[in-house]
Amino acid sequence: MNNLPEDCIAKILSLTTPLDVCRLSAVSSIFRSAAGSDDVWNHFLPADFPAGFAAPAGLPTRKQLFFSLVDNPLLINGTLLSFSLERKSGNKCYMMAARALNIVWGHEQRYWHWISLPNTRFGEVAELIMVWWLEITGKINITLLSDDTLYAAYFVFKWNHSPYGFRQPVETSLVLADTESTDNVVQPSMISLMQDSGGEEGQSPVLRRDGWYEVELGQFFKRRGDLGEIEMSLKETKGPYEKKGLIVYGIEIRPVP
């Protein structure tokens, strides 16, 4: 294949994945040159960026833009939603800020405080002071997501110095409302927010590289032509005891590996 013109190699590479292109760039100098082509990386960038998207300055190549969107999520829609790309596939990822979520009693200072923490994407996160009724819901338009892709939604959080009341499981659901998909079903499940609460495999939180925890709320498949909203929620409203110490970063929606 080294005898093929570089533009032909670039065309072939554009039919693979970003991960494959990075691997194949080590084959030879002509592959390395073709792997840096804008034609290749245009194929991996979305054809329809979300409204409000503005490419960062100082990125002269499409490859640089791609990896900037992988490593540095961009804020859109003010400061309530971040947009990024998944490294292996180039599929779209989003994270909804805590302020974009419907948190019951979230505007009552005796129950929740809105605080700023370093090294976060958004200006504020929500710190739980005390509630008995915990209910958090987020919605996102399914048309923002990449077609023909399996997605998962993750609740992203951490604890302050004195968490209390979270030893019991928390109920979650994921609803594909008003879509044309045949999979527009509710996925109720029980998860643990505490790592040592004995939750089932896959239902306990995982520590992320950024120092926050995440726990999966559910999965859904985005088909071409799907319309409507995805509603993601978690709640604990049955326990007769107070809950406190939870810090909410947001909900992240990204492709399943």
UniProtKB/Swiss-Prot annotation:
CDD domains (UniProt xref): F-box_AtSKIP3-like
Pathway assigned to this chain's UniProt record: Protein modification; protein ubiquitination
Gene3D superfamilies registered for this protein in UniProt: 1.20.1280.50
InterPro entries: F-box-like_dom_sf (IPR036047), F-box_dom (IPR001810), PP2-like (IPR025886)
Swiss-Prot/TrEMBL keywords: Nucleus, Ubl conjugation pathway
Start and end residues of each F-box domain: 1-44
GO CC term, one of those recorded: nucleus
Cellular compartment(s): Nucleus
One of the protein's GO biological processes: protein ubiquitination
Gene Ontology molecular-function annotations: carbohydrate binding
Self-association state and partner proteins as the record states: Part of a SCF (ASK-cullin-F-box) protein ligase complex. Interacts with SKP1A/ASK1 and SPK1B/ASK2.
Function: Component of SCF(ASK-cullin-F-box) E3 ubiquitin ligase complexes, which may mediate the ubiquitination and subsequent proteasomal degradation of target proteins.
Comment field on protein domains: The F-box is necessary for the interaction with ASK proteins.
Protein name: F-box protein PP2-B11
Organism: Arabidopsis thaliana (Mouse-ear cress)
Source species taxonomy: Eukaryota, Viridiplantae, Streptophyta, Embryophyta, Tracheophyta
